[in-house]
Every structure is written in structure tokens, then in C-alpha cells.
Amino acid sequence: MSGGLDILSLKEDDITKMLVATTHLGSENVNFQMEQYVYKRRADGVNIINLGKTWEKLQLAARAIVAIDNASDVFVISSRPIGQRAVLKFAKYTDTTPIAGRFTPGAFTNQIQPAFREPRLLVVTDPNTDHQPIMEASYVNIPVIAFTNTDSPLRYIDIAIPCNNKSAHSIGLMWWLLAREVLRLRGTISRSVEWPVVVDLFFYRDPEEAEKEEAAAKELLPPPKIEEAVDHPVEETTNWADEVAAETVGGVEDWNEDTVKTSWGSDGQF
């Protein structure tokens, strides 16, 4: 799929990320249509996925997404909790439409209901849990891209990206790689420059574990310092109210004592 171009080939750094996230580890069962993507089978029965074919299908899926003129017509879906955060982040950076959580039955086929949508392309996290949108897409001829494990059914799926879709880190990494490839094909970011968005943002975090981590971080913090009260010398101030009151009392004359008796008569008598 890379056409022999080194710039499109799978880099060592990406291979390391996939191995750390256990993207290459499939399930113990194999669907007959997924046998072509299995590299070998381990002694414990776990099937190893060929990461070279995973990368080729990832590039093919990115080209299909870029071919859609209006990015909002591409719907990215995840019913499983481990893929919901990755779907929301993917939609944020690629301007696609996310459906995280329960899918409303009839959203693609029932034109009466308010939630009716007409997408041009679907990208689902798991064909087993997202079977309802895949089935409805087959009724209205909507192409489907899916992250598939070794035991995933490929019915009604047009582009299958083989990977470990049962691991939170693996599925988060695959959505991150797909988002990066889409942005590169659009010309938003360069292939020679590292994408500044870290893959950790696409990983699912259990709310209970997140609360425990926050509580543990608070316990490691040093106790807050209590500042001791400092006694500052109080300056002696005079009470201006007393001074004003004293001046007022001393300066007021008694008008009753100096009352001048006058008479209306000429002799001065009343």
C-alpha cells in the first residue's frame, strides 16, 4: 500500500508503540476471513497479527476518509467504553462526527425519528459491539471501516484494520495513528514533523482509577504551612470624638443667663 515509498513505510517508532500497546496480540480464535492477517500462532494459543498489513489497511482507511469532501459526513462510532474517548478525540482533530456510547436504532434507516442521519462513511471500533450501525449501513449502502480482531466477523465491512481491539491502549493508539495519517494526507501536518498531540489523550481512563490517582497525588503533597500570627505594635491614637465633644461643651454659651429684657414701652417697663 505504501507503493515502495520510504516516507509511507512503517517507521520503527510506530512499531515500538504498537508492540508496547499490544496491538499485535489477537485472540485465541480466528475467523476464516481474518486468517490472511495472522502472522503466526503462539504456543499459548494467542494469534499474532501481522503489523505490516495493519499499517497498509490503516493507510487505505485514511485515504477513504480523506476522499469524503465534507468531513462531518464521516461518522466514528464506539459503543465500548474503552474506545469512546478515542472516538471523541479523533472527531475533534479531524472534524468528523462522533457517536460515543449507545447507538440509537434506526438512526440511519428511520427517517421519521429526530436522530436520523445520512453519513457517507462509518468507522467503528469493534464489529461485535457496533453491529447495529454496521447492519443499518448495509441497508443504505454506506461503506464501513472497522478495527477488527482475529475473531471479528467481516460481514458488511469494506475495510478491515487488523489489530487488538480489546485493549484500551491498543485501540487508543490505532485511533491516534489513523487521525495522524488523515491529517497528513490532508496536508494539515507534515510527515517530517512529529505530531504534537500525544497518544495518551486517546487512552481510556477508568473514572474510579482516576479518582484514586488524584487522591494519592494529594496525599503526597506536603501539608500546607500555617502562618503564625504576628503581634504588631499598636500606635497610640487619640480619640478625636472626645476632643470635639470637649470643645463643643466649653464653647457653648448659655443664652438664658444673658437674656436682654426689652419692653415695648417707652419707659422700659412691661
From Swiss-Prot:
Subcellular location: Cytoplasm; Nucleus
PROSITE patterns reported for this sequence: RIBOSOMAL_S2_1 (PS00962), RIBOSOMAL_S2_2 (PS00963)
Pfam families, per database record: 40S_SA_C (PF16122), Ribosomal_S2 (PF00318)
An example Gene Ontology biological process: ribosomal small subunit assembly
Gene Ontology CC annotations of this record: cytosolic small ribosomal subunit; nucleus
Gene Ontology MF terms: ribosome binding; structural constituent of ribosome
Domain of life: Eukaryota
Sequence ranges of Polar residues compositional bias: 261-270
Keyword annotations from UniProtKB, A to Z: Cytoplasm, Developmental protein, Nucleus, Ribonucleoprotein, Ribosomal protein
UniProt KW Cell inner membrane keyword: no
Segments for region (Disordered): 251-270
NCBIfam families: uS2_euk_arch
Function: Required for the assembly and/or stability of the 40S ribosomal subunit. Required for the processing of the 20S rRNA-precursor to mature 18S rRNA in a late step of the maturation of 40S ribosomal subunits. Required during oogenesis and imaginal development.
Assembly information from the UniProt record: Component of the small ribosomal subunit. Mature ribosomes consist of a small (40S) and a large (60S) subunit. The 40S subunit contains about 33 different proteins and 1 molecule of RNA (18S). The 60S subunit contains about 49 different proteins and 3 molecules of RNA (28S, 5.8S and 5S). Interacts with oho23B/rpS21.
Entry similarity comment: Belongs to the universal ribosomal protein uS2 family.
Protein's UniProt name: Small ribosomal subunit protein uS2
